[in-house]
Amino acid sequence: MRVLGVDPGLTRCGFGVVDGGNGRTVTPVAVDVVRTPADLELSSRLLRISEAAESWIDLHRPEVVAIERVFAQHNVRTAMGTAQAGGVVALAAARRGIPVCFHTPSEVKAAVTGSGSADKAQVTAMVTRILKLAAAPRPADAADALALAICHCWRAPMIERMARAEAAAAEQKRRYQARLAEVKKAGTR
């Protein structure tokens, strides 16, 4: 499975592609960070990120895009910009019919380090080790993008099993409710 991991941000947006194999085998394909100047209008910055996402998707042809979920930050403005950057990447993937999955920072940290509270240095060190890289990806946004892709490769089978279980439970509930309605209807005759 080829996964494009994206660490969204207005100033620096990390992109990382890995190929996931059997078990926990992952192979690095590409990594980079797209930068946008703070003095540009927001719309221009988002356009640059969107164009970069489209280019990465067209070049690397991922089966899925994994984006960091923004849920809380102390600086509301930063959180909004990060969410907007993630949104334009999700839109670029959706336009190409590519599924998008969101992972929280703690999910990503736990997947690659074993601890949901790991710091950036620990995440970078483990990404370097897992992917057998000669040097650590820099800046941290690049390592985070690769970590997101790794996380998704490792969590995808579980996510798929959960989706199948939820679908089966919903079908079972539908059948039960239909049978219950039949019994009630028969009892009122």
Curated annotation (Swiss-Prot):
GO BP terms: DNA recombination; DNA repair
Subcellular compartments: Cytoplasm
Cofactor binding, note field: Binds 2 Mg(2+) ion per subunit.
Residues binding Mg(2+) 2: E68
CDD domains named in the record: RuvC
Keyword Flavoprotein applies: no
EC number of the protein: 3.1.21.10
A molecular function (GO) term: magnesium ion binding
Required co-factors: Mg(2+)
Listed InterPro entries: RNaseH-like_sf, RNaseH_sf, X-over_junc_endoDNase_Mg_BS, X-over_junc_endoDNase_RuvC
Keywords for the protein's UniProt record, in alphabetical order: Cytoplasm, DNA damage, DNA recombination, DNA repair, DNA-binding, Endonuclease, Hydrolase, Magnesium, Metal-binding, Nuclease
Domain of life of the native organism: Bacteria
Top EC class, one word: hydrolase
GO cellular component: cytoplasm; Holliday junction resolvase complex
Active site: D7, E68, D141
Binding residues for Mg(2+) 1: D7, D141
Record's catalysed reaction(s): Endonucleolytic cleavage at a junction such as a reciprocal single-stranded crossover between two homologous DNA duplexes (Holliday junction)
Family the UniProt entry places it in: Belongs to the RuvC family.
Functional note: The RuvA-RuvB-RuvC complex processes Holliday junction (HJ) DNA during genetic recombination and DNA repair. Endonuclease that resolves HJ intermediates. Cleaves cruciform DNA by making single-stranded nicks across the HJ at symmetrical positions within the homologous arms, yielding a 5'-phosphate and a 3'-hydroxyl group; requires a central core of homology in the junction. The consensus cleavage sequence is 5'-(A/T)TT(C/G)-3'. Cleavage occurs on the 3'-side of the TT dinucleotide at the point of strand exchange.
Quaternary structure note: Homodimer which binds Holliday junction (HJ) DNA. The HJ becomes 2-fold symmetrical on binding to RuvC with unstacked arms; it has a different conformation from HJ DNA in complex with RuvA. In the full resolvosome a probable DNA-RuvA(4)-RuvB(12)-RuvC(2) complex forms which resolves the HJ.
Protein name as it appears in the record: Crossover junction endodeoxyribonuclease RuvC
Organism: Rhodococcus opacus (strain B4)
Source organism phylogeny: Bacteria, Bacillati, Actinomycetota, Actinomycetes, Mycobacteriales
Gene that encodes the chain: ruvC
